[in-house]
Amino acid sequence: MATKKPENLSFEQALEELTTIVSEMEQGDLSLEQSLKQFERGIALAGASSSKLQQAEQKVAILMGKDEKSVLTDFDNDME
């Protein structure tokens, strides 16, 4: 099976693959060459995921801008 380019994966697919790569690298069983290859793939996946998140944020900002009363605020994970 051919590996898809990171930009052609959905956000969820990229995140799942990135999680797998991190897990494999943390185990420490990969050779140096394999580790570098996985690291390179991980960087590409992280970049593509970041780009997809930025696009989603822009879409939300545009949608929120259509309603002048709406205020876009930062997410606070500590709120209960």
Swiss-Prot record:
Job of this protein: Bidirectionally degrades single-stranded DNA into large acid-insoluble oligonucleotides, which are then degraded further into small acid-soluble oligonucleotides.
The species this protein was found in: Pseudoalteromonas translucida (strain TAC 125)
Keyword Hydrolase: yes
Chief location category: cytoplasm
Family: Belongs to the XseB family.
Alphabetical keyword list: Cytoplasm, Exonuclease, Hydrolase, Nuclease
Top-level EC class as recorded in UniProt: hydrolase
HAMAP family: Exonuc_7_S (MF_00337)
InterPro entries linked: Exonuc_VII_S, Exonuc_VII_ssu_sf
The protein's name in its UniProt record: Exodeoxyribonuclease 7 small subunit
Description of how the protein assembles with itself and partners: Heterooligomer composed of large and small subunits.
Protein encoded by which gene: xseB
Extent of the signal sequence: none
GO BP of this protein: DNA catabolic process
UniProt catalytic activity: Exonucleolytic cleavage in either 5'- to 3'- or 3'- to 5'-direction to yield nucleoside 5'-phosphates
GO cellular component terms, A-Z: cytosol; exodeoxyribonuclease VII complex
Phylogenetic classification of the source organism: Bacteria, Pseudomonadati, Pseudomonadota, Gammaproteobacteria, Alteromonadales
E.C. designation(s): 3.1.11.6
MF term (GO), any: exodeoxyribonuclease VII activity
UniProt subcellular location: Cytoplasm
Keyword hit for rRNA-binding: no
